[in-house]
């Protein structure tokens, strides 16, 4: 499979209410940090968080989000798509991104050898990026402007 240029941001990160002073892993040890157990976010957090960080592992995403919204955890570790939904459904909580743990932008897969199709897809992505449509979609679905994305 060949991959197109990136067209959308996806990342895992730390999200918290305004006033929670977290900008890196080193700041997490002052807070209760919620994460869905057994996920890539959990593995990364376990590896990079300082010793003594109070990591609250929850069995599934729904319980993880409920714990955060209820104030049982201070920091939500999750993907930006999930966080965007939590932010939009809880505007009074004033939740904001704190830092990115891992970037994993979205690409379109094309059958290997399909050079014309790959070029068409890349031109389409470029056209929609330059025309602002991808930024509009990023704002609508992620609540953030389209960041610089890698190009292949």
Where are these regions (language model features)?
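Short helices/loops that flank or line small-molecule/ion binding pockets
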Residues: 2, 26-27, 47-50, 61-81, ...
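Flexible hinge/capping segments at coil-to-helix
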Residues: 7, 16-33
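Beta->alpha turn/N-cap motifs
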Residues: 17-18, 38-40, 60-61, 77-84
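Short amphipathic alpha-helical coupling segments at ligand-binding clamshell hinges
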Residues: 27, 79, 113-127, 133-137
């Amino acid at each position: 499979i060949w991959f197109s240029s990136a067209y959308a941001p996806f990342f895992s990160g730390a999200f918290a209410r305004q006033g929670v002073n977290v900008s890196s892993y080193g700041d997490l040890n002052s807070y209760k940090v919620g994460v869905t157990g057994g996920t890539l976010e959990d593995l990364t957090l376990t590896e990079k968080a300082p010793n003594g960080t109070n990591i609250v592992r929850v069995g599934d995403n729904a319980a993880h989000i409920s714990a955060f919204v209820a104030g049982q955890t201070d920091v939500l570790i999750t993907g930006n798509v999930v966080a965007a939904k939590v932010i939009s459904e809880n505007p009074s909580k004033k939740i904001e991104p704190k830092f990115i743990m891992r970037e994993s932008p979205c690409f379109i897969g094309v059958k290997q050898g399909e050079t014309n199709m790959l070029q068409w897809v890349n031109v389409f992505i470029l056209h929609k990026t330059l025309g602002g449509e991808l930024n509009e979609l990023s704002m609508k679905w992620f609540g953030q402007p389209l960041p610089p994305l890698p190009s292949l």
